[in-house]
Amino acid sequence: LQKMRAWPDAPKTACPSPAAYMKQFLDDGDNYIVTLSGRLSGSYNAAVQAKTIYQDEGGKGNVHVFNSRSASSGQVQVALLIRELADSGLPFGQVVEQVETFIDRMKTLFVLETLDNLRKNGRLTKVQSLVTGALRVKLLMGATREGEIEKLSQGLSIRQTLARMVSRMAEDADHAGRRLVIAHCNCPERAEHVLEMVRQRCQFGEVQIVPTSGIATVYANDGGIVTAY
């Protein structure tokens, strides 16, 4: 994180190659791949290529690639649901169908301390990033149904914007009883603060806190909070 802050250019990331995915496939089992939003990373396309090559070469295992249309906490949500459904004994096709339906309904909300890495990698307009940095405005962002980033609101401080994020959850009639995953980038205390607000205002059936990792850490950057339900 310190090296990324000090480096003036975009942090370089690379998605797994199709061959790297294929090395993990099981010929005698079900293979589920969950990727970062296809609008943010080449991981989804690489995984789809891996599936195609594997099947063309006569691979016998079942393979499905899930485009989470989210990041970090959203990927965790999808992975948890896959495990729950598979462990319950559902056949491969039904697991895929139910998880794809869940992804269609999943909501992703996030607040970042800085937008620099998103800007440097072309995920935000340069003007938007420079303006928010100059004004010290913190944006409440979300994911569209296609997995693209959109601005939802803003605040003058990160605590104010996090509070607005929780308010948005509380006002969503569909959130009650669902699982919320809170992912944090090097800020566990901030995640706990969000959890406390959620407990006071929302009716989630379950809440989990997880750290970001991999490419999600690059985009969330130090202090970022990414939620999905």
Regions of interest found by a model, annotated:
Residues M4-W7, D28, F102, M106:
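Alpha-helix boundary/capping residues
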Residues W7, Q24-Y32, E206, Y229:
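Generic structural signal for short, solvent-exposed loop/turn connectors between secondary structure elements
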Residues L40-S43, A47-T52, N62-H64, S70-Y229:
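Mixed-charge interfacial surface used for oligomerization/domain docking
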Residues S17-A47, Y54:
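N-terminal glycine-rich phosphate/adenylate-binding segment common to multiple enzyme folds
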Residues M4, G29-I33, Q55-F66, I209:
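Glycine/charged-rich beta-loop-alpha catalytic/anionic-binding loops adjacent to active sites
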Residues L1-A20:
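N-terminal glycine-rich anion-binding loop in soluble enzyme alpha/beta folds
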